[in-house]
Design a protein with these regions (language model features):
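Phosphate-binding loop of NTP-binding sites
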Residues: 2-191, 198-213
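Adenine nucleotide phosphate-binding catalytic loops in nucleotide-utilizing enzymes
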Residues: 188-253
Length: 253
């Protein structure tokens, strides 16, 4: 470990310890300080276990908790961020809370909720094995800017990523990312079968209306919600993806 990384870990651990002694939350502040003094602070940690990241506009916290519960039920030691500190600073603080004085993180899996815009930042410095991408909606525009800009940011990261990518086949903005890296053979899709609340009538939404490859208006067999549903492009054939995992008989009553 370099002297700079050693200082980063020791200083960070002292901050966490001090905050705990004062009865204060160490959720985000230590990571914010470390990012200020060392932009490569995540590289100071030694994480030898697989990292699973969950991202998307909606549902990150729930899916992260589901996956963590599944792994823990199998007897695995899990480190996760159930309270949603999902920015680079929050993830840095999480690792500080769980590492030893040499920056070593001991677990069977890290399951990390991660803000979409921070995926490239965090996982250019941590060795990610699996990225789960749920959806893209416009309800975070005030924070992340135009949704297409955000999608392209994630796409650029995926162009060189060769780990597992788990994508929502029912969201055209997510499904398109399965083609970001033609050399990655670890692309997997999931889907939710039509449920009782689905409709044949389109929602008034901007995202997911046109094919991302040929700009033709997409045809939907049905809409689950907003632009999420069974879709295909009548011109280039994008869509109608056969998922590896499909959730059936969804009962929301």
């Amino acid at each position: 470990m370099s002297l700079k990384n050693a200082f980063t870990i020791i200083f960070g651990k002292l901050m966490v310890k001090t905050l705990h002694l004062l009865g204060r939350d160490a959720g985000n502040f230590p990571g914010l300080v470390l990012w200020t003094i060392n932009k490569d602070c995540l590289k100071a940690f030694k994480v030898d276990c697989p990292i699973v990241a969950v991202t998307g506009t909606n549902g990150k916290t729930s899916v992260t908790n589901y996956l963590s519960h599944i792994f823990a039920s199998g007897g695995k030691k899990i480190i996760t961020n159930p309270e949603g500190n999902n920015l680079d600073t929050g993830i840095c603080s999480l690792l500080l809370n769980h590492c030893d004085m040499r920056g070593r993180v001991h677990a069977d899996y890290l399951v990390l909720e991660t803000d979409e815009s921070h995926v490239p930042v965090v996982y250019s410095k941590l060795n990610l094995q699996t990225l789960v991408l749920l959806n893209f909606f416009r309800d975070q525009l005030d924070r992340n800017g135009e949704v297409e800009t955000l999608i392209l940011k994630v796409k650029k990261f995926l162009e060189t990523f060769e780990g597992n990518v788990v994508l929502n086949a029912d969201d055209p903005n997510v499904a398109r990312l399965g083609l970001a890296n033609p050399n990655n053979k670890n692309i997997h899709y999931f889907s939710v079968d039509r449920y009782q609340g689905a409709t044949d009538k389109p929602y008034e939404v901007g995202e997911g209306k046109f094919c991302p490859f040929c700009d033709t208006e997409l045809v939907y067999d049905y809409y689950q919600y907003s632009h999420i549903g069974k879709f295909h492009c009548p011109k280039c054939g994008f869509g109608n993806i056969e998922p590896e995992v499909e959730i059936k008989n969804v009962d929301l009553t």
